[in-house]
Amino acid sequence: MKLNNVSLSYGKKVVASNINAQLLPGELVCLVGRNGAGKSTLIKHILNIYPDPKLISVVLTDKIDVERLTVRDVVAMGRMPYTGFFGKLTKHDEEVVTSSIKLLGMEDFADRQFTTLSDGERQKAIIAKALAQETPYILLDEPTAFLDHPSKVSCMKLLRSLCKEQGKAILISTHDIEVALQECDKVWWMADGTLREMTVDSFSPNLL
């Protein structure tokens, strides 16, 4: 995935320009910057450039309306690019859904109503949905939001393992800098109206 001379606007305001970056298979990249730097706008821009749901799965901060659906139902929505909106799940689809639920440690919540979950539990279910989509690229906007510290660490280690073991390319936008830097391969730092690719060693949270 390449970004070549990308400009980002929020309304009529240009928030960043001349963005050049590349996300490679097997990489876990941390997207950081102050509020308003354009991190969420960049993620949405990438989705506009690469709209194929079999290529990129995404976890955004927007709340989803899934009244009366169970956690399993929500995770199964990740299979829609392969089944269609009203498509019947195959045995393989069911196995992928179950595996994704287990990876997030949500087995005991699988048959619970999504709307009864805490914010942290909902976040895990949405990440499981993204995993069930089985895409080579995953974009996550604040994936560790609402999670307690052990769950933040566990989430980052899971994302790291997906990169190493399955060759997925993952971009996460986060304010949990110290936790993320423990697992990330490199940093995309948004500041001063542009983006800089940096190694983890060369980046300091003091820059924010």
Residue locations for each model-derived region?
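Catalytic Walker B motif of ABC-type/P-loop ATPase nucleotide-binding domains
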Residues: 138-141
